[in-house]
Structure formats: structure tokens, C-alpha cells
């Protein structure tokens, strides 16, 4: 075990320093290093290459569950336990969460809708329940605001809109684009918080025009839009945290890449636990077939 620690830390300390710290001889270390690798060690080295490949391809986003599942789907022996150990030994950790303050402004006198979902975020068929929210992204040029519409049956991001201002026009654009992409479905429950943008006359007018049903979380209820908050959390951790955007254009490209290329479409790479570890689009395609 001590000799293995040497190998993992050679880039930080000289062999002489590590020998003194761990009270072992140089000759003993070099003798250990010259031995042929066991079958297990050789297998671990090959697995390590695959783990690093997946980890780098997904920009440090996935943890051990998604990496092990993806490698298993590729036909490679990659138990969760082995992946955890190898990632830990090499200091590879999925991107960690960072706290972000809320953007919702519920202090207004606009009409609000009742909470029809009541934390039931399961949908039995497509276009039965949608959820929406606004999140924000900092760039060196200032803030960007992202409005997302999420389909609860497949957890697919139906559509989204992004702007320098957090206005009613932003959420209206996201909803209109979602309607067009889904071929104008009727009777969809569209759930959001009680922010002034969602309570605006312009946004609520779309519900009348397109025969949608408005639903809103209760004021101060942090679980009222939990499915959307969960998506926001994943987005911030996997696409935003640790990134520095010099321009708004850089951030917009990152948003597009995450939603349209990574989250919605990549079959195995975006392993969604609630969908049996397949992508939202693959889940929908299987159900239709």
C-alpha cells in the first residue's frame, strides 16, 4: 500500500522524500516497481483509462454511478465499488454544488393560480405536466437570465429562452417556443412559482389562447417546484459552476451545448436516473415505439 502511494504522488514529491516520510528503502520501492503487474492491477489500469475518458468527455460532470453505468453499457466490467475506489485514489470528483440565491419575486398584487401539482411531479403521458422557472448566469459583461420549460414525462427540456433582462417577455418566449416544438398541445398543466413574470397578464394570456392550465407553488414553498429546482441544480453544477464567461455569447453557447447537445440528446452519456439511466429523448422514443 505504501509503494502504491509513492506512484500516485511522484509528481509532488521525490522518491527520497517519500522513502524518508514512510520509513521504507529506495531499493525496496524500485524492486516493487519492477515487478510485473497482477491481472487485477492490469484490469484496473485499463478501467482507469476508461474512467478518465468518460470523466473528461463529460467535463468532470459525472460521478461514479453514471460512469459505471455508462461503461457497463459499453460492455466493460465496471462495478460501482471499483469505479468509486479508482476515482477516489486519483482525486477525481464530480463537480460540486454551489449555493445560489433565489430569483423569484413573489411580492406583488398580481393574480395567482392554485397549486394543482401539489408536489406530484409524475406524468403518465407526454404533455400532461410541464414545469418552468428562471435561473441566472453571471458573465463579465453582466447577468443573463434563462427561462426553461421542462416536460415531466420524459424530463426533457422542451425549450428555453435567454435574455439580459428578467421580464415577462422572457417566460412568454420560452412557453411559446415549447408549444411550437410540441405541436400546440391542449390541456397541459404548466406549473411555476409565483414570480411576477409568471403572474403577468401577457404570460397568463397565453394560457387562454392555447387552452393551457396554470398552476403555481404556494408562496415560500421551497418544494413546490422541486422538479424544476432539481434541473436548475444539475445545470448550475454541470454547466456553470467553475466556469468563467468573458462574454454573454460565451455563456449562451454553454447553455445551448448543455441543453441541446448534452442533456437532451446524448443517449448514454446523459444518464438520467429517474428514466432508468437513458436520455430524455431516448426515453420518449422508446415509449412511442
Regions found by a protein language model. Name each.
Residues 1-289:
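Charged DNA-binding/catalytic regions of mobile-element recombinases
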